[in-house]
Amino acid sequence: MRSVVEQGYRNVEYSVLDGGSTDRTIEILRKYDAQLSFWRSEKDGGQAAAINEGFHRATGDILCWLNSDDLHVATTLTAVAGLLGSRLDAPIVLYGGCEMFNDRTHWREVRPAISFSRGLLETVDFLNQPSLFWTRRVWEVVGPFDETLHYGLDWDWFLRASKVCQFVMTDALLSRYRLHDAQKTGAGGEKRWSELLEIVRRHSSPAVVSHYEFLVRHGSARWWLNKRMRIFQRLCRWSPKIAGSVADLLSPPFWNLPSDIDKEVLWQISGIR
């Protein structure tokens, strides 16, 4: 919360919607009560429902949401207001870079924004969610988040937005994303992959769908992709040059892939850039 209330940009409408936490959340919310436009802590319909409620209450011209584990950097809101302030009538989504970090291991890595590609977004969610901001016009055109989704609700919404809105990249670092063992992304297992398959069936090409169907059917393939991703990330942090030279050696042992399955697409789906 401090990363928001301590921003240099003051024209902020800040609402907090908590699903009834039993820790010190209410105590902390009361501490910041004077700096919040609205807050509540009670059982709700899940993350998508809470996000929809927050945006339904919002009256500002530029919108975003920040999960409880994540942070804005000190200059985020000033930078976003400068980039979007003169374009408020257009349906524009702004996205930037993000620093990933782990408090337990003290690991940090900057994940820069990359050029927007609708085709790549249909394959994998490459956007840094805490670093996305959009004009109110986007919300009016795209509509609310799908409350039936649990793991890929943001990706589904981004895909819907990409059909009717302009995505604009900034090189600025806009957020910090905290990694920990209890995250939904890492803990979802087969349920998460089944939901991702549902999303690509809605939005993506038959070729992309076939790759997700393959991964849903083959848990060992998902394991190898995850293993390769982690090894490659560690090598990149140690020596990007060596990582690039041995990337092919880290290829999962998919010797007998079906003819319609491409190893490079599987590599994209793993999330490594």
Language-model segment annotations:
Residues M1-E190:
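Nucleotide-sugar donor-binding/catalytic module of glycosyltransferases
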Residues T105, V138, L149, W155-D156, ...:
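C-terminal subregions of glycosyltransferases and related glycan-biosynthesis enzymes
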